[in-house]
Amino acid sequence: MRAGFLSGAVLYALGQGCTLLFQWLLLRQFGMQGYGEVGLAHLGLLTVLFLADLGYASLFLREDPASADWVVRWRRALWHRLLATLALDLAWVAGAWWQSGGQGEGFAYLLAALPATLLGLVGYSAPLLAQGRRLAGFGVQQVAMPAAIAAWLALRGMPGWEGGMGAGVAVSLGYLVQAVANVAVFGGPPRLLLPEAAGGGHMLGTGLRLSALGIAGTLHDRLTPFLLASAAPAFLPRYLFLGYLIGGASGVFNQFNRLLLAEAHNDPGARWTRSLVSLVLALSALGAQAVLAAAEAWGTAAQQAWLPWVMPVLATGAIVLSGGVLSAQLIGRHRESALLRVLVCGFSCSALLQLAAAAWHAPLPLLWSRLLCILGIAVASLQLCGLRLRPGGHAALWSLLLAAALWLGAGGWVLAAVLLVPVAWSAWRHRSLLYPAQETRP
């Protein structure tokens, strides 16, 4: 099992590497300003693909494709997903038209990428994983971006195809190749591609409950770039690229988190949770110092000017990675209801604070509002898991936050560096920055 998930993590990492490469190619093609429009449109595509799943990717992970009624259930799910996709596509186009008036490279990309939302419905990763075909199940999810890169490299040299429309067509072609690969690898009957409209209401409700956690997080994640589009358009391209980088790291990490779902009640699962969170905290605090030192030594004046914006985003990403491990532990213990309450409360506070900051055209408070609310969610999740931070864990967290708070000046940076000493001591002495709440802290 571990080997299967490790191979899945490697495949996911390769897929995310291709996603980053595609974004870099778009950045080179359109420049900072143009990439802001196209990158936001691509983010919309990913949002539609995720929301239109309706939780069925999780639901069909636990269903046997060999069961008698599986084909009927799959076709009913396909009907629900098709309706959701069409509704989301309509809302996406209407929102983009209202924002851009139907002009610009971003809107052209959107229209050309619309077929990808329908082609994305043809995916058999969940039933492949349910069959135990883990390598195939992980692999068929990562075909679209390599194919899109190949198509874009071919199209952008042709007259009339070098703009947003050509990039969108390349993405649609990538998802077409992925759909064909899914059909070929899974080898199911052709009628799986035909939606069935009758029934499936109870199944839909189950899928939506399973996806509630992911939907809440995705909607919250997508809010920030849309607010930055008006509050700080110059920073938006950088934020989008950082988002893809952090999202890729989070996705790779989640391949390991899935093991916690089966081992949440066992001592190995609990130790793994403590080890992973400790590793993320320690490396994040150390990495923040490395970023600051590298920027000071080799960064240009323009790059250093963006550091007060970049550091809170990176700190938020590090805390999200830790929170993902804690969430997997809670879901494995069947405490997703408690986790959902924490997420809804934290995301609601974050959204309100971000909206207020955007209304005042205060992008830095917007980024810090998001960071602090995500931190609050992580702390609450830590409590729900029955875990506490050792002094070294507190030091790592404070070091990360101080490194992100560049408005404190050199004093904050020095204090953040000094705090790495107790982090190193705790990691060496206890092999962990956390301990179970029922234990007396050593």
Feature locations, PLM:
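Alpha-helical transmembrane segments of multi-pass membrane transport and lipid-handling proteins
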Residues: 52-53, 78-103, 154-155, 253, ...
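Transmembrane helical elements of multi-pass membrane transporters/channels
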Residues: 4-19, 144-145, 167-186, 190, ...
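Membrane-interface junctions at transmembrane-helix termini in multi-pass inner-membrane proteins
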Residues: 117-140, 263-265, 315-345, 385-387
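Membrane-proximal transmembrane or re-entrant/amphipathic helices at the cytosolic face
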Residues: 406-442
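Helix-loop junctions and terminal segments of transmembrane helices
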Residues: 52-68, 130, 242-278, 329-332
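Signature of the first transmembrane helix
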Residues: 1-54, 149, 208-231, 419-424
